[in-house]
Design a protein with these regions (language model features):
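Bacterial N-terminal signal peptides that target proteins for export
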Residues: 1-8
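Bacterial N-terminal signal peptides
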Residues: 8-16
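Sec/Tat signal peptide C-region and signal peptidase I cleavage site
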Residues: 17-21
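Repetitive, compositionally biased segments used for assembly/scaffolding
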Residues: 23-154
Length: 154
């Protein structure tokens, strides 16, 4: 009897953990642009903007180049625990949530991320909290997927 209860409880516990995964996963990558925050969504259904990535530059709607230096980038993410802007990316009513999708959907931006070639945005990422893909998604999300970003902060 106790084994049956345990076996039936395991899927319920797993479902509960999955449903509340955002509280267990910690803060998601986020940037502030003016009065707006742009954050990677915990769950794709939460996001107003979905972006995807392609390895084919001909399929891209936005090109993001990985810069070799922070000076050569429009946007830089560098982990620096001693120089963090506390609350710079606090979630608020104006927070835009961005999800990274496995494939292109509708009019959603398709990002070509590369170290070479022409680019709409240039990013520099040296971080344990952000990946280059997440930084690219946030920068594109900050520009509504179509416009160049002027200034952002962590």
């Amino acid at each position: 009897m106790s084994i049956k209860i345990l076996v039936s409880a395991v899927p319920l516990v797993a479902a509960a953990l999955f449903a509340h995964g955002e509280s267990l996963s910690g803060p998601q990558p986020c940037i502030s642009v003016g009065d707006t925050s742009v954050q990677i969504a915990n769950l794709p259904g939460q996001a107003a903007l979905h972006v995807s990535f392609t390895d084919d530059p001909a399929l891209a709607t936005v090109r993001v180049q990985i810069a070799e230096t922070a000076e050569g980038a429009d946007f830089a993410v560098v982990d620096d625990a001693g120089n963090s802007e506390g609350g710079a990316c606090a979630a608020n009513a104006a927070t835009r949530l961005v999800a990274i999708s496995a494939g292109a959907t509708g009019n959603a931006p398709v990002i070509y991320l590369s170290a070479e070639g022409p680019a709409d945005y240039r990013i520099f990422v040296r971080s344990q909290a952000f990946t280059a893909r997440e930084a690219a998604a946030l920068v594109v999300g900050a520009g509504d997927g179509h416009h160049r970003l002027t200034a952002a902060s962590l």
